Amino acid sequence: MTYKEIIKNKEINAYLKKGNENLGQLGYTDHSQKHCMQVAHQAGKILKKLGYSEHEIELAQIAGYMHDIGNVINRSHHAEYGALLANELLKETDMTLEDRVTIVPRFCSYCSCKTGRRNDQRGGCMPGDFICT
């Protein structure tokens, strides 16, 4: 599953669209597909500059695009809801288990990690965690 395929996925886009509508009713600013594409683009740009592999960059772009998917359920804890939704949606694709378990935990950590330093230690920031803050 590639980033280009993810941004064309009808189910993912339906969740993002409805989540943005829900947030709009609550007075939040734009969390549309456009916002998600900007996050994905910035994630890719920053990770490329930091010397990450093309594969890691693509995973960060996928996570960046999907990072607000949990807003379809609730703004509060949207990262956790997003991780659960993303895992189920990505199971239905050809994405490997290894890639899925790399992406899904990022949904729960991006809100708290703001350093941008590479730290692959358990519990630390991973590539792209700081992008979505």
PLM-predicted stretches and their roles:
Residues M1-H78, L89-E92:
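Acidic/His-rich, divalent-metal-binding segments that scaffold phosphate/diphosphate chemistry
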